[in-house]
Curated annotation (Swiss-Prot):
Name of protein: Glucose-6-phosphate isomerase
Gene3D superfamilies: 1.10.1390.10, Glucose-6-phosphate isomerase like protein, domain 1
Gene name in the database record: pgi
Role of this protein: Catalyzes the reversible isomerization of glucose-6-phosphate to fructose-6-phosphate.
Keywords from the UniProt entry: Cytoplasm, Gluconeogenesis, Glycolysis, Isomerase
Gene Ontology biological process terms from the UniProt entry: gluconeogenesis; glucose 6-phosphate metabolic process; glycolytic process
Coiled-coil intervals, chain numbering: none
Key word Cytoplasm present: yes
InterPro entries, alphabetized: G6P_Isomerase, G6P_Isomerase_C, Phosphoglucose_isomerase_CS, SIS_dom_sf, SIS_PGI_1, SIS_PGI_2
């Protein structure tokens, strides 16, 4: 494999000076040859510096780590999360009902389907008003309390699927900062609000702190017994029972589902409440279709594999340590934040599976904002900054508002213009002509030409799809899940643990008494100084 890395680096050195526009000039079919589809979803990667040699080498790299076998191992229930000795089966949560997927000799699919049916029955009763409040009325609002994977996915999904909302309004609380829960609850009526507490162990400090606050809020209006207004997503039935939540309203999931991969099951309860079991099922079906594509499509035509290999090319071969995800879809405005956890918590690792230091960079910094907002914020740096940041555009052919089709056309024009501008740039000579046309001449025109020129040659990919439906949204999220997996396999890391979050939590537990006045003399000078400054 080291030989392939060397060949990739040598090829990059030999072709780095080639403008992207030359690839199109030399190949009239470049778009067709450097794009791939999964159903009606298209990935255009023609505006990257890949040529046939680089792409072939990247595919060889994937083959050298046996990516296809690793995909099969993950989807069949092998315990590929080696540091925790766990299977990794978020794909099973959206598998067909008749699938057979075994963990320790037991088919997990019937259990998944049973919980999904329980979720559907509860969501339907809540939506139809047959499951009622303590005072005998219909619930109007749902507050989901969770953090990390228990929050980011459902928050993103309920916004993405807003056109399909026909259930109670869903609200989300994650931050332990009291301002968050205060502001969410301030606009709600406790008499018609259901609180869903999402914590697998029921020990997550932020979630349990917010849960206690919410319960006290409910009790202030309803009296001591507020169990009717509570549901939970957890496996800790003893703890949920102690909080007064009956087992019938506790939805559990196994330890082979990681938090950041969990919204396809019980963590997705608020999504199902918002859009209904049928639309939630379409969301699962879209993800399942992408799972099948990832498992079966040849690497050269495989969207998640290609996106992962492009990420490796940009990160490890080109030295671009950041990537911007730019959805030209306002309802995907939470996608970049979701991908930050999915990508950076999965692949932000510095050791290989055997515990040895990695020989090369792993996960990049992932960030972004929806277009066209970002154009009026950070695109300046994308176009003219000293760092090259690969960009990933997402755009639908049509929106959900036919009466506003002219605005969607403007959105599409902006998206395509940005990817074109990043590639083309503007030469110094062209910039000087513009300066002259604006009234500058001589030295002033030369000076302005530097400001008005764009280097171009900045890579981007575009993901295009017909419309942001539940099915398509499921495809998009699963695509990015599998892209992360592809990159993790290439780098030889475990993408399914997160030991890096532990130390800060441990120190926070020890620091809390000091924040409240206990002796801090053994702490470092900076921490002592900050404790003194923040003391109340």
């Amino acid at each position: 494999m080291s030989d392939i890395w060397q060949q990739l680096s040598a090829h990059r050195a030999a072709t780095e000076a080639t403008p992207l526009t030359d690839y199109f000039a030399q190949d009239a079919d470049r778009f067709a040859r450097y794009s791939a589809s999964a159903g009606e979803m298209l990935l255009d990667y023609s505006k990257t510096a890949l040529d046939d040699t680089a792409r072939d080498l990247l595919v060889q790299l994937a083959e050298s780590v046996d990516l296809k076998s690793r995909i099969a191992a993950m989807m069949s229930g092998a315990k590929i999360n080696s540091t925790e000795n766990r299977a990794v089966l978020h794909t099973a949560l959206r598998a067909p009902k008749d699938a057979v997927i075994e963990v320790d000799g037991e088919n997990v699919v019937p259990g998944i389907q049973k919980v999904l049916a329980q979720m559907g029955a509860f969501a339907t009763a809540l939506r139809e008003g047959s499951y009622q409040t303590k005072t005998g009325t219909a619930f109007t609002d749902v507050v989901n309390i969770g953090i990390g994977g228990s929050d980011l996915g459902p928050v993103m999904a309920t916004l993405a699927l807003a056109p399909y909302h026909d259930g109670p309004a869903c609200h989300f609380v994650s931050n332990v900062d009291g301002a968050h829960i205060h502001d969410v609850l301030a606009g709600l009526n406790p008499e018609t609000t259901l609180v869903v507490i999402a914590s697998k162990t029921f020990t997550t400090i932020e979630t349990m702190t917010n849960a206690e606050t919410a319960i006290q809020w409910l009790k202030g209006a309803l009296g001591e017994d507020v169990s009717t207004h509570l549901a939970a997503v957890s496996t800790a039935l003893d703890k949920t029972a102690a909080m007064g939540i009956p087992d019938a309203r506790v939805f559990g999931f196994a330890d082979w589902v990681g938090g950041r991969y969990s919204m396809w099951g019980p963590i997705g309860l608020p999504i199902m409440i918002a859009v209904g079991p049928e639309s939630f099922g379409e969301f699962l079906a879209g993800a399942a279709a992408m799972d099948q594509h990832f498992r079966d499509a040849p690497l050269m035509e495989n969207l998640p594999a290609l996106l992962g290999l492009i990420g490796v090319w940009h990160n490890n071969i080109c030295g671009y340590g950041s990537r911007a995800v730019l959805p030209y879809d306002q309802r995907l405005s939470r996608l970049p934040a979701y991908l930050q956890q999915l990508d950076m918590e999965s692949n932000g690792k510095s050791v290989a599976l055997d515990g040895s230091p990695l020989p090369r960079a792993s996960g990049p910094v992932v960030w972004g904002e929806p277009g066209t907002n970002g154009q009026h914020a950070f695109y300046q740096l994308l176009h003219q900054g000293t760092q090259v940041i690969p960009t990933e555009f997402l755009i639908a052919a049509t929106g959900h508002e036919p009466e506003l089709a002219h605005q969607h056309n403007l959105l599409k024009a902006n998206c395509l213009a940005q990817s074109e501008a990043l590639m083309l740039g503007r030469s110094w000579d062209e910039a000087r002509e513009i300066a002259i046309a604006r009234g500058f001449d001589g030295v002033d025109a030369d000076r302005m030409a530097g400001h008005l020129s764009f280097p171009g040659n900045r890579p981007s990919v575009t993901l295009a799809y017909p419309k942001l439906t539940p099915f398509v949204f499921g495809q998009i999220v699963a695509l990015y899940e599998h892209r992360v997996f592809t990159e993790g396999v290439i780098w030889g890391i475990n993408s399914f643990d997160q030991w890096g979050v532990e130390l800060g939590k441990e120190l926070a537990t020890r620091l809390l008494p000091m924040v409240e006045g206990a002796d801090a003399s053994q702490k470092d000078a900076s921490t002592r100084g900050l404790l003194a400054k923040l003391s109340t």
